[in-house]
């Protein structure tokens, strides 16, 4: 039964023994946000009239795509069915489920003592659930296995509870069966959270230490920082210090979100809440950082803090060059809310002024691009995504390349590219086609495990550059949509990579340059010149389109010249007269060819850069 507001313990005065911090781990579309909605309703923190689906997903893109991008934290009062008078406080931390946001997930997990592992009873375990489960196990969290959507006709609760039990090492009977849509079994789940998740452990009179697990930008109040207090206490109007940057701020407001913000006097050990310091830049409150009080503060930060590193780079250019200032302002505003987004201005001879933007992965790229187009009304061209290469020259110098046009000329001794460890889960009948796909993408098989007789987990080492194009789309189409993919960076390897330039009429077009593996360079060149031949309109003179590695041309197509019929006014008559006219035309064409320049229409850029087979598309990565 929902706890009535009169017996709910106040923040800062809650006994840590009554607090339970937990999160929900689930693959996309397995019903995590719906389960969160049911919990909000059952505990009575959201009025029935204000309830809407996916209550915690505030961004339009989150609601439409059904994905959670930013973590949320909600304080839920709950009195277990066995002891109705004893109200506990459950802090539910809603985590992103996507592989691009793994660091955010790991920080959210570090703020919890337990986790609900939610699996769709019709689909079973997917790769991203598995990746987050391993993260939870590394953090020694208590895992509560739950099967969702048991009201579906296609549900197979017995089969999947067996699979879950094998994975975690519990009995199939321990797997709870719920339907987040109808609310069936959710009360039992909340009771189990109270019974099984350990209470937070911390020293109440030690110097205050709190971990930031998320920060969001509010246009009225500045940055709102979500924290979990580990030791000590934070009080209103205290001065605090960020331990990674040493910056100090005053706590203007402190409180809990339930799920709307409720100010309080302070936060004690084990509590999860928010702080407002009036800071205007999210980069000053970094996810994973430790907060302490300015006087008598802690000397040792909590472990696990990392700066998010961009993995994938893409150039973003406005279709209309005059929108450049708007694009800069839009990126500035998005960066307030997304500390992992990095960008710097760049110019392209072909596309004009734009920005080189760094992302955590393909979904991150897609979401940012969609937000720029939707929230700021910008029309953009995005160049094909690139990864970061490290190039060692024979003279010992080293270059970091995030853009093909920066690839150094001259004698190169080694090129290093980032590699990832990919985990693919799929029905066992597709093993052959998955292995074939990974082999063509220069993958190395690490191992293979059967989770049950018809589901298999395949592990590969793959170059990140091979994944950022259309790997996910290909994987889905080869497995009829059943495979799921997860990857994590594992360092770098030396590869024989070359830069392929596209020359139009002898001039390089920087927007079409690409860094590819030596073996794939010829195919890339042939495909691109053939495509450009179709897209570039015919000129009054002949235009060669060439693909070249350095000074060696590897592929060529020619756009034939348009010819005017100069013989139209000659009726019969002398052949030498006709020859004279044709020679004169030929001379003119030759002169034109020497001074002429080729205009590449905007449509050709868009078609080439967003085409599936040249790899500019990240659409399938949802």
Curated annotation (Swiss-Prot):
As for membrane topology, the entry says: Peripheral membrane protein
Q: Any idea of its EC number?
A: 3.6.5.n1
SUPFAM superfamilies linked:
EF-G C-terminal domain-like, P-loop containing nucleoside triphosphate hydrolases, Translation proteins
Q: Which GO terms describe its cellular component?
A: plasma membrane
Annotated transmembrane regions: none
HAMAP family reported for this sequence: LepA
Q: What is this protein called?
A: Elongation factor 4
């Amino acid at each position: 039964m929902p706890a009535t507001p009169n017996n709910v313990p106040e923040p800062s005065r809650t006994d840590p023994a009554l607090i339970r911090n937990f999160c929900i781990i689930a693959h996309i579309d397995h019903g995590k946000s719906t389960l969160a909605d049911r919990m909000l309703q059952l505990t009575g923190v959201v009025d029935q009239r204000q309830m809407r689906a996916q209550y915690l997903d505030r961004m339009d893109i989150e609601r439409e795509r059904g994905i959670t991008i930013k973590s949320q934290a909600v304080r839920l009062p709950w009195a277990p069915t066995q002891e109705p008078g004893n109200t506990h406080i459950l802090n539910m931390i809603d985590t992103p489920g996507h592989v691009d946001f793994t660091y955010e997930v790991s920080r959210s997990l570090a703020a919890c003592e337990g986790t609900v592992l939610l699996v769709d009873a019709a689909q079973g375990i997917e790769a991203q659930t598995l990746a987050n489960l391993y993260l939870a196990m590394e953090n020694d969290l208590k895992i509560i296995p739950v099967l969702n959507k048991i009201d579906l006709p296609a549900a197979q609760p017995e089969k999947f509870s067996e699979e879950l039990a094998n994975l975690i090492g519990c009995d199939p009977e321990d797997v709870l069966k719920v339907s987040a849509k109808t609310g069936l079994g959710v009360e039992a789940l909340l009771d189990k959270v109270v019974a099984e998740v350990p209470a937070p452990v911390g020293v109440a009179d030690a110097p205050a230490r709190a971990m930031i697990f998320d920060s969001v930008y509010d246009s009225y109040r500045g940055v709102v920082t979500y924290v979990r207090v580990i030791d000590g206490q934070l009080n209103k109007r205290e001065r605090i210090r960020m331990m990674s940057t040493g910056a100090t701020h005053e706590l203007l407001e402190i409180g809990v979100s339930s799920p709307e913000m409720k100010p309080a006097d302070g936060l004690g050990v084990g509590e999860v809440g928010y702080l407002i310091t009036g800071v205007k830049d999210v980069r000053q409150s970094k996810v994973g950082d430790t907060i302490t009080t300015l006087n008598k503060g802690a000397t040792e930060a909590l472990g696990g803090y990392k700066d998010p590193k961009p993995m994938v780079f893409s150039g973003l250019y406005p279709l209309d060059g005059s929108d450049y200032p708007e694009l800069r302002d839009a990126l500035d505003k998005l960066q307030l809310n997304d500390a992992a987004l990095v960008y710097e201005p760049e110019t392209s001879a072909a596309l004009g002024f734009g920005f080189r933007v760094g992302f955590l992965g393909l979904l991150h790229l897609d979401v940012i691009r969609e937000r720029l187009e939707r929230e700021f009304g910008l029309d953009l061209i995005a160049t094909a995504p690139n990864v970061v290469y490290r190039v060692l020259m024979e003279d010992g110098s080293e270059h970091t390349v995030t853009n093909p046009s920066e690839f150094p000329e001259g004698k190169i001794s080694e090129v290093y590219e980032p590699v990832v460890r990919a985990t693919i889960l799929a029905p066992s009948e597709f093993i052959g086609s998955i292995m074939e796909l990974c082999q063509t993408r220069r993958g190395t098989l690490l191992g293979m495990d059967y989770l049950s007789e018809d589901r298999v987990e395949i592990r590969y080492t793959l170059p990140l550059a091979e994944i950022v194009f259309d790997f996910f789309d290909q994987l889905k189409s080869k497995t009829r949509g059943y495979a799921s993919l997860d990857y994590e960076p594992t360092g770098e390897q030396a590869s024989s990579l070359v830069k392929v330039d596209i020359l139009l009429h002898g001039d390089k077009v920087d927007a079409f340059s690409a860094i590819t593996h030596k073996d794939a360079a010829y195919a890339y060149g042939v495909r691109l010149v053939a495509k450009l031949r179709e897209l570039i309109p015919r000129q009054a003179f002949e235009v060669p389109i060439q693909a070249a590695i350095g000074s060696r041309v590897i592929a060529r197509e020619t756009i034939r010249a348009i010819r005017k019929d100069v013989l139209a006014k000659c009726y019969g008559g002398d052949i030498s007269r006709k020859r004279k006219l044709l020679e004169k035309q030929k001379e003119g064409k030759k002169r034109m060819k020497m001074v002429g320049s080729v205009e590449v229409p905007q449509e050709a850029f868009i078609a080439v850069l967003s085409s599936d087979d040249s790899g500019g598309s990240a659409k399938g990565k949802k």
